[in-house]
Amino acid sequence: MTKTEFLEYVKKNNIDLKKYNFVIGEKSNTPYTVGCYEEGEKWYLYEVGERQNFSIVKSGDEKEIFNYLYFTLRGNINM
């Protein structure tokens, strides 16, 4: 899944990413956040813990990162 496909899925299903503490395309230090950002041609998936500890969970290409985000988001919502 690409970033565009992920965002289309979110829009189609009226999902508020902020409600689930998801951040796309930038770093955040908000506790309990899951997000991703791109540096160069590499994508990074991160989590922010209770005490604002920023941890990179995974790095890879766009499809790999957005597939992970998609399944994480699906696990957090009841559709």
Residue ranges and their predicted role:
Residues 1, 14, 54-60:
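Short, exposed beta-strand "edge-strand" segments with a Pro/Gly-rich flavor and a Y/T-containing core
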Residues 6, 16, 36-38, 44, ...:
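Structured catalytic/translocation cores of nucleotide/phosphate-coupled proteins
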Residues 4, 60-75:
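A short, charged, amphipathic alpha-helix used as a generic interaction element across diverse proteins
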Residues 18, 23, 27, 32-34, ...:
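General N-terminal targeting signals
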Residues 1-28:
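Negatively charged, low-complexity tracts enriched in Asp/Glu with abundant Ser/Thr
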Residues 11, 16, 55, 68-79:
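Short arginine-rich
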Residues 27-54, 72:
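Short aromatic-glycine-(Arg/Gly/Cys) micro-motifs in beta-strand/loop hairpins
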